[in-house]
């Protein structure tokens, strides 16, 4: 399944993996998964975290290594994001609920994820998604960005 991913997708997933793998040991534990989920405004129980890991933990060691992570991401991409998942993701970024993601909101979420971005990088991310050029990302633009991957 992971063999259907492009080089670029694999590189992006490698970056995402290292955001989860806080101690850099090459595996994601339930604790690390929980930290990331909570920084995204989710509140999974210990059992839910364990279930998420067990779903893809091919070698049964209780953690997710990079090949297992790739399998999980490939699977997730196959059941392409439902409208509801995309709306939920938009709400995570749209902190003030005004229907737009501003540069400040994007920076806030990325910083919570442990991703330190320069102002230029944040502005570039906004520009890439900002179709109407108003300097922020509305829901339609967000959907286009999420589904054009």
Swiss-Prot record:
The residues that the entry says bind Ca(2+) 1 are 21, 23, 25, 27, 32
Q: Which domain of life is it from?
A: Eukaryota
Gene Ontology CC annotation, any one: myosin II complex
Q: Where, by residue number, does Ca(2+) 4 bind? A: 130, 132, 134, 136, 141
Q: Where is the EF-hand domain?
A: 8-43, 44-79, 81-116, 117-149
Binding, Ca(2+) 2? 57, 59, 61, 63, 68
Read off the CDD domains from this record. Answer: EFh
Q: Which residues carry this modification: N6,N6,N6-trimethyllysine?
A: 116
A GO molecular function annotation here is: calcium ion binding
Q: Which InterPro entries match?
A: CALM/Myosin/TropC-like, EF-hand-dom_pair, EF_Hand_1_Ca_BS, EF_hand_dom
Q: Where does Ca(2+) 3 bind?
A: 94, 96, 98, 105
Any Pfam family matching the protein: EF-hand_7
Q: Which residues carry this modification: N-acetylalanine?
A: 2
Please provide the record's keywords in A-Z order. Answer: Acetylation, Calcium, Metal-binding, Methylation, Repeat
| Family designation | Belongs to the calmodulin family.
Function according to Swiss-Prot or TrEMBL: Calmodulin mediates the control of a large number of enzymes, ion channels and other proteins by Ca(2+). Among the enzymes to be stimulated by the calmodulin-Ca(2+) complex are a number of protein kinases and phosphatases.
Other facts noted in the record for this chain: This protein has four functional calcium-binding sites.
This protein is called: Calmodulin
Source species:
Renilla reniformis (Sea pansy)
Q: Read off the lineage from the record.
A: Eukaryota, Metazoa, Cnidaria, Anthozoa, Octocorallia
